[in-house]
Amino acid sequence: MSDTPTRREFLLTASMAALVSQHVAGQSTAVQPFRFQRIETNGVTLRCAIEGTGPLVIMVHGFPELWYSWRHQIRPVADAGFRVVAPDVRGYGESDKPHPVAAYDMVSLTGDIVGLIDALGEDQAILVGHDWGAPICWNTAALHPERIAAVAGLSVPFFQRGPAPSLENWRNLYGNGFFYQLYFETEGVAEAAFEADVRTALRKLYYTISGDGEHAPLHSLSAPEPVDDVVGTMVDPDPFPSWLTEPDLDYFTAAFEQGGFRGPLNRYRAQGRDWELLPQLSRLQVHQPSTFIAGALDPVRTFVPGVDLYAGAGANCTDFRGSTIIDGKGHWIQQEAPLLSLVLNPPRHAH
């Protein structure tokens, strides 16, 4: 794959197009039209949805999701002349689920992406990541710059390694109050809460941090006091907003009923290892063409009270093409919003 500036700009445009959907609210994309392949990478096997031919675009989901979160974007980008690969991240869906917390550190997860590129016979890929998929993509671009042509992060901007581990920072910030990542830290607690009724837990979480859940309890994923019954505190909407259909929820539910939540939750628990193993991330930047896309009502934006974490999204990206913040939308941006304008040009800034 050529690495000329013109080519790289074209690839960035394609990564923006990866977010574009002709999705009509209330419609669901059937699973069966997509082609699936199990690919060995970095000591694990990942189940991937694969469509199209051409330059490689890898779409990386977050918590608690699946390849299916990209169901509205896979085919439009493949039809535009790209080879789109959307894996179930390790720990999820039909991919391998190692038991140890250490198997979910950022070294392992970025290694999975590089291994996918190798296994698919490519030199480079465009990366598009959402939620935890965004740090996986940002960090792969920073750690392996020669392998990544462009990167788009959704929901979570690129943050360099801080002076202390993330969970320590959250503990200092929230004290005795509730913050979801601290709740996830103790093995078995969140697993029991979510696995008691997977469908209800997913339904409540998907609603709570969406744009529709702006005023719902725990929309910020934090509270000034401890919260003992997290799932019980969240609202169960009736009806659910049209961006997630009952068949969509069926698909997510079946996957998590079968695979559980330990692997996905282990990603949060492995953050201390990231800090220990990757000190170079305190200075590395993302030099590839890059952009950031999020919903204006995404709770990630206000994780640090009084600070807009999206304001400096490109601070450590040397070829940053701007942020696109979508009014009225929340955390599940590629499912909540059709981003039709992005197919035309790489964004500078839009609201």
Residue ranges and their predicted role:
Residues 50-96:
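Conserved HGGG/HGGXW glycine-rich cap/lid loop of the alpha/beta-hydrolase fold
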Residues 22-42, 351:
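C-terminal segment of N-terminal export signals and the immediately downstream linker at the start
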Residues 32-34, 46, 92-128, 132-321:
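Flexible "cap/lid" subdomain of the alpha/beta-hydrolase fold that forms the substrate-access gate
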Residues 318-351:
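Catalytic active-site module of serine/aspartate enzymes centered on a nucleophile-bearing elbow/loop
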Residues 2-17:
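N-terminal secretory signal peptides and thylakoid transit peptides that target proteins
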Residues 89, 156, 328:
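Active-site loop/turn elements of alpha/beta-hydrolase fold enzymes
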Residues 62, 105, 336-337:
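Active-site helix-initiating loop/hinge in glycosyltransferases
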Residues 42-50:
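A short loop-to-beta-strand scaffold at the N-terminal edge of the catalytic core in hydrolase folds
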